[in-house]
């Protein structure tokens, strides 16, 4: 896998770092750690929305050198929370995020994959929390989907599983896996350690803005490292062939 983004001594006030790491094309990287660990701060910095100490290079160039419009063609970012902007149909909201507005087939395909096919005519301000979250996810997927955007490279997601039920989480995992196979790098924050253990290629474990461990998921999500991050004892068991983490009291 080729390196897509390099972070060196990235820090932001007392909330983050300094930390260094790399993101490769076609990999799924999970940011894990307790509340206040700095996951959202790091994602916003990687998206180019904030500034601070250290340096980030994206696609071989300093992140701050990218023009905003050009950067939006290469990376998409889902914030943790966002209210509907104003009343508009779901299909209209999704179209605003498409680089090629004529590709209605791509819009319908992504909407169907996320269970939104029957909601395209609904107004975004009349959706449930879970429905709105899936609309937001569909929008950022369409923004960098390789079938419609040949320069899409990076998808940054802040707690994308919020408000999704088990079936909807599974549907999102399938979409992300498809993007990963197409070469898109995905960086997302997660509070579900077992989900990370099954679906991430790599993980960064943070606590109070510091990077405790980074690397392959099974090397990072160990009882020893997790105890440092969460102050709890953990055990890793094998359940029907799947490694599973439980907190040990």
UniProtKB/Swiss-Prot annotation:
Pfam families: ABC_tran. It is found in: Cell inner membrane. Residues 1-233 form the ABC transporter domain. GO terms for molecular function: ABC-type vitamin B12 transporter activity; ATP binding; ATP hydrolysis activity. InterPro entries: AAA+_ATPase, ABC_transporter-like_ATP-bd, ABC_transporter-like_CS, ABC_transptr_BtuD, Metal_Ion_Import_ABC, P-loop_NTPase. It comes from the Bacteria. ATP binds at residues 33-40. Its main location: membrane. It is a peripheral membrane protein. GO terms for cellular component: plasma membrane. It catalyses: an R-cob(III)alamin(out) + ATP + H2O = an R-cob(III)alamin(in) + ADP + phosphate + H(+). Transmembrane segments: none annotated. Keywords: ATP-binding, Cell inner membrane, Cell membrane, Membrane, Nucleotide-binding, Translocase, Transport. It is an enzyme of class 7 (translocase). Its EC number is 7.6.2.8. PANTHER family: METAL TRANSPORT SYSTEM ATP-BINDING PROTEIN TM_0124-RELATED, VITAMIN B12 IMPORT ATP-BINDING PROTEIN BTUD. The complex is composed of two ATP-binding proteins (BtuD), two transmembrane proteins (BtuC) and a solute-binding protein (BtuF). Belongs to the ABC transporter superfamily. Vitamin B12 importer (TC 3.A.1.13.1) family. Part of the ABC transporter complex BtuCDF involved in vitamin B12 import. Responsible for energy coupling to the transport system. This is Vitamin B12 import ATP-binding protein BtuD. The gene is btuD.
